[in-house]
């Protein structure tokens, strides 16, 4: 499944519990090299980029590594799957 499809599936299928989901991206500026972005921060997604609400932040989809559910640490989608 493409990352765009996985993001949209979570956004629409689990919209009542959307605050329980995060996207994990590669981020050179963090100590771990990873950063979690809550699904509540997502404005939209297209074939190449993830756009965040209220910011001028645009994240290339190739930086997205996984989608995770926080409550039970379940892996919803992972790059390469």
Swiss-Prot record:
Belongs to the UPF0248 family. It comes from the Archaea. This is UPF0248 protein SSO2687. Pfam families: MJ1316. InterPro entries: MJ1316, UPF0248. It comes from Saccharolobus solfataricus (strain ATCC 35092 / DSM 1617 / JCM 11322 / P2) (Sulfolobus solfataricus).
């Amino acid at each position: 499944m493409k990352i765009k499809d996985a993001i949209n599936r979570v956004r629409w299928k689990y919209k009542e519990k959307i605050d329980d989901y995060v996207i994990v991206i590669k981020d050179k500026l963090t100590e771990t090299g990873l950063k979690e972005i809550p699904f509540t921060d997502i404005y939209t997604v297209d074939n190449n980029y993830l756009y965040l609400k209220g910011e001028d932040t645009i994240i290339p989809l190739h930086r997205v590594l996984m989608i995770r559910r926080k409550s039970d640490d379940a892996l919803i989608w992972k790059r390469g799957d």
